[in-house]
Structures are given as C-alpha cells and as structure tokens.
Amino acid sequence: MALKITQVKGLVGTKPNHRANMESLGLKRIGHSVVKQDTPIIRGMVHKVRHLVTVEEVAGE
C-alpha cells in the first residue's frame, strides 16, 4: 500500500519544523503530490502537517 500526499496549503507563517517536514516529504508547492510507501515514519510525518496536506491511499508500489 502507498500514500499519495498532496500539499493543499502554503508554508508562509508555519513553524520551521513543519517546513522541514514538508521538505523531507518532498513537497515544494501547493498542488504538488508525491507517492510514498505507507510506513509508520511517513504516517508520523504526515500527522505533524495534516493541516497542510491531503492523503489518499493508492494501490501499488
């Protein structure tokens, strides 16, 4: 199982650790999406920035 993570809000005014988290996920701009493996580490990173992203489960990978 994989997760499709899409950035839906900008990073202006966010905490530095949230910006670092988004960079680690590979998200750079609003509307940008990445597909990551569903692991506890990725789930934790998404949980920290859940107000900035949307998450969908996708089959494959």
UniProtKB/Swiss-Prot annotation:
Cite the InterPro entries for this sequence. Answer: Ribo_uL30_ferredoxin-like_sf, Ribosomal_uL30_bac-type, Ribosomal_uL30_ferredoxin-like
- A Pfam match: Ribosomal_L30
**Quick one: a GO biological-process term for this protein?**
translation
> Which ranges form a coiled coil?
none
Keywords assigned by UniProt, alphabetized: Ribonucleoprotein, Ribosomal protein
Provide the assembly information: Part of the 50S ribosomal subunit.
- Matches recorded under NCBIfam families: rpmD_bact (TIGR01308)
The similarity annotation says:
Belongs to the universal ribosomal protein uL30 family.
Protein name as catalogued: Large ribosomal subunit protein uL30
Annotated source species: Corynebacterium aurimucosum (strain ATCC 700975 / DSM 44827 / CIP 107346 / CN-1)
Tell me the lineage of the source organism: Bacteria, Bacillati, Actinomycetota, Actinomycetes, Mycobacteriales
